[in-house]
Swiss-Prot record:
Function (record text): Required for the formation of the mature spore wall, where it is needed to ensure correct localization of 1,3-beta-glucan.
Underlying gene: meu10
Protein origin, superkingdom: Eukaryota
Taxonomic path: Eukaryota, Fungi, Dikarya, Ascomycota, Taphrinomycotina
InterPro entries reported for this sequence: CWI-Assembly_Regulator, Rcpt_L-dom_sf
GO cellular component, one term: extracellular region
Alphabetical GO biological process terms: ascospore wall biogenesis
Alphabetical UniProt keywords: Cell wall, Cytoplasm, Glycoprotein, Meiosis, Secreted, Signal, Sporulation
Extent of the signal sequence: 1-29
Glycosylation sites (chain numbering): N51, N57, N160, N234, N244, N304, N373, N381
Disulfide bridge positions per record: none
Primary localisation category: cytoplasm
Subcellular location, record wording: Cytoplasm; Secreted, Cell wall; Spore wall
Protein name: Meiotic expression up-regulated protein 10
Residue stretches spanning the membrane: none
Length: 416
């Protein structure tokens, strides 16, 4: 074991010399402990509290047991090991910094029955991880990232609030059930997990940015405010119901939801960016926005719908593009009524090939730079089969480009 600071209380040879007989808890203090083997870890077996971080970066260990340690005030990071099959955090109840498991190709199980609080939980590129045991339940984590695992459930992760939640490229994950989650301050992304995945967030009230991609079942009945953008992409949802949302700070978009037949946003009053619906062939009517008054960006609807009902809409600061194949469509807007403030005004039916606005085309690299790895398309380092699938690439690319436009235009709507 190596200590990374010149100032420390003990070395690997005398770790127990500072433990005073009968004193509880036994506290070990050094900014960072670098471990490579179970023997290195055993040196800390008399420490109940580690005031610092424990890091394993490359190792050939096949299993790790953290024995008597109960609290780590810094980070616990285990990564870059092709042999490690199991990790037991038997007594650990709290990790003040980040708990990270990353690039552990054989890791099959994580056992942490007492763990309740972490600063940040990251589980990335663990292609054989099928089991996690968080028996007590993780109730606090500022950031949660679950990416490229074989987990089928996130049972044992039961947050009340968090800053960021990213759950992507877990091909066996069939449910994201967070019954007590009430707020996500920054980002909530669920993308490219099992096709039949169910996302249940019955108490969620506020969120920053939210992207729901390739989801089969969704529960957002209590959602009241989205501070950033809200997007539903490539899902098999038949009904999307957010009956209590009153405000969306940036864009709202529905793209590639081929089985979608109904929308319910009956309390929504304002959208701070673009409002887009595209590639949703089963959506025959666009309605369910009884109180929508203002759209700070543009309206861009394309599809097969026969009607658009926005009865309270009075102000669209951007342009209008409504194109449908239906011959029964009658445009609900007139350029002379003053509702549409932008320069572009397209609103017609019987269109053979409805097209989105020209502004929807952006370079794919620009999109990746904006949203980063592991949000819509997954991480560059991901081993997930989804990333390698040609079908997935063909299916998702145009929608990723459109999403870039939506996020960008929400900040520049006044220029349209």
């Amino acid at each position: 074991m190596r200590l990374s600071s010149r100032f420390y209380l003990f070395t690997s040879f005398t770790a127990w010399s500072v433990v005073i007989a009968g004193a509880t808890p036994a506290v070990c203090g050094a900014p960072e402990y670098i471990i490579e083997t179970q023997n290195d870890l055993d040196v800390l077996s008399n420490c109940q509290v580690v005031n610092g971080s424990i890091i394993m970066n490359t190792s050939s260990a096949t299993s790790l047991n953290f024995n008597r340690i109960e609290t780590i005030t810094g980070d616990l990071i285990i990564r870059n090991n092709n042999y490690l099959a199991s990790v037991a955090l038997t007594s650990i109840s709290s990790v003040g910094g980040e708990l990270r498991f990353e690039k552990l190709t054989r890791l099959a199980s994580v056992y942490a029955p007492q763990l309740a609080n972490v600063g940040q939980l990251t589980m990335r590129i663990l292609p054989n991880l099928q089991g996690i045991r968080f028996d007590k339940g993780i109730k606090k984590a500022h950031k949660l990232t679950i990416e490229d695992t074989q987990l089928s459930t996130l049972a044992g992760i039961s947050l009340n609030t968090t800053d960021t939640m990213v759950i992507v490229n877990n091909n066996y994950l069939r449910e994201v059930d967070m019954p007590y989650l009430e707020s996500v301050e920054s980002k909530f992304y669920v993308s490219y997990n099992a096709r039949e995945i169910s996302v249940t967030l019955p108490r969620l009230k506020t969120v920053g940015d939210m992207t729901i991609q390739r989801v089969a079942h969704l529960q957002l009945s209590n959602l009241e405010e989205v501070k950033g953008f809200l997007g539903f992409l490539n899902s098999t949802l038949q009904d999307i119901s957010c009956p209590n949302i009153t405000r969306i700070g940036q864009s709202l978009f529905f793209i590639g939801n081929q089985e979608l037949t109904s929308l319910n946003f009956k309390q929504l009053e304002s959208i701070g960016g673009t409002f887009m619906i595209a590639n949703s062939a089963a959506l025959a009517q666009i309605k369910g926005y009884d109180k929508l008054k203002t759209v700070a960006g543009s309206i861009d609807f394309t599809g097969n719908f026969s009607s658009v009902e926005l009865p309270k809409l009075r102000d669209v600061k951007g342009g209008l593009n409504i194109q449908t194949t239906s011959s029964d469509f009658t445009c609900p807007f007139r350029q002379s009524d003053g509702i549409i403030k932008g320069k572009s005004f397209v609103c017609r039916g019987s269109v053979d090939n409805p097209r989105q606005s020209k502004e929807s085309s952006f370079d794919d690299d620009d999109f990746d730079e904006l949203l980063g790895n592991g949000t819509i398309k997954g991480s560059k380092n991901s081993t997930s089969p989804v990333k390698q699938s040609g079908a997935a690439k063909v299916d998702s690319r145009p929608f990723r480009l459109v999403t870039f436009f939506l996020v960008l235009v929400s900040g520049f709507a006044h220029l349209l």
